[in-house]
């Protein structure tokens, strides 16, 4: 009977001790958490106050804030007519003084093929004014190829330019292809026939297409 009472007493003491230890430990943890949280809130509050004070001091000492306010009309005038633009428009360009607008160029296309030559004169709008080839100049079949036929074709085109009085001021010469006809056209422009238009030539271009790979070409034409 005495043993039974001692066991119950020890059990109740153990239970009460565990509950009290849990209570006190939780209380200590709560107090620690509360103190840490209060310190964090204090640090956050201090940082916010410091940043507010710093921003106020910065804005109070900034030159842009203390600068006098400009009117809207003056701002619009400065944006619409800047000094650099007004200076550029006021000062005349010495290169362009005494010169009119540059007229649009005419185009002379010389397609120099192996068996024929095509020369076309185009307006600044790229419309055909006159064209000539071996057939229009009276050459037939194999006679359309060669130096003489190309020279005759070019001289006929230059003659038509002189007859029609087109008033060409600028001329672009564009070559297509490599053959004897190309040399003939060049010599005709540099010769007596091209004296009328030679001073008007401002640009010479070569637009010969160059083939890189691709499919097999057509068979060679035989006349």
From Swiss-Prot:
GO terms of biological process kind: mitochondrial translation; translation
Which keywords does the record carry? Answer: Mitochondrion, Ribonucleoprotein, Ribosomal protein, Transit peptide
Top-level taxon of origin: Eukaryota
Main localization (coarse)? mitochondrion
What GO annotations for molecular function exist for this entry?
Answer: structural constituent of ribosome
Subcellular location(s): the record lists:
Mitochondrion
Task: Give the record's family classification.
Answer: Belongs to the universal ribosomal protein uS11 family.
Protein name in UniProt = Small ribosomal subunit protein uS11m
Name the source organism: Schizosaccharomyces pombe (strain 972 / ATCC 24843) (Fission yeast)
The opening ranks of the lineage are:
Eukaryota, Fungi, Dikarya, Ascomycota, Taphrinomycotina
Q: Which gene encodes it?
A: mrps18
